[in-house]
Amino acid sequence: MNLFLITSAIHTNYSNTSPEDRLRETIDTAESIKKYAPDSKIILIEGGKPLPQHIKDRLSIFNEIFDFSDHPVMQMTQSDAQLAVDNVGHSVKSAGEAYILKEALKKIDGTYDRIFKLSGRYRLTERFNIQDHIHKDKYVFLPKAPTDKMNMIDADAKTIVTKSSIDFSPWRYETTFYSFDNIPKAQMIFEYIFNSLVETYSEGNYIDIETATYLTINKEDVIEVPVIGLTGVLGMDDRSIDK
């Protein structure tokens, strides 16, 4: 069996989209998985504001919900990240995502052929081919892409992080949708990324999870595929993607 981990923030201050629309789109995410990856287990990992029970009742399409919305670390992460928000005028959600992923992996029971991380509100398409992901002990990503210019806070020094061992990179991995099969290894990766991002933000610097992921994962452990079968609208840009 395969497992889909859906990272979500249905109620959040960092979006112009209403909670009702975000809820509907998150349900659409699960429905697309049932269509294109039937018999998979689907877990919602919620990191936004606490969900009222009537909202949780509408999320029955998910096999489980891991709710980290009221966790003290999530509140701390948002506070530290505000430093970077002030610097670059952009909502920083990367540390929160790394945190809920590393914590979610600790709660997973059972063995799975493949674990897919998919951001809520995006959907699988007919171009999704599960065979593209069958690579033991490998991460499967879309091809690396140029780093967003917002990561270049200290262009003169060519570095973003001063103490966390993450340096400037011209490349990033798209983390909206990817897969892996080694849970202990992935848990260590997310732990390292989370600690590095929090340290970075607390120093008033900025790096996103996409660039940090590229810098952290051993390139020999990565398989890049040209098409991954994903569609949706980028929340910050209102720009449609189909990859």
Which residues make up each language-model segment?
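ER/Golgi luminal nucleotide-sugar-dependent glycosyltransferases, focusing on the catalytic module
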Residues: 1-243
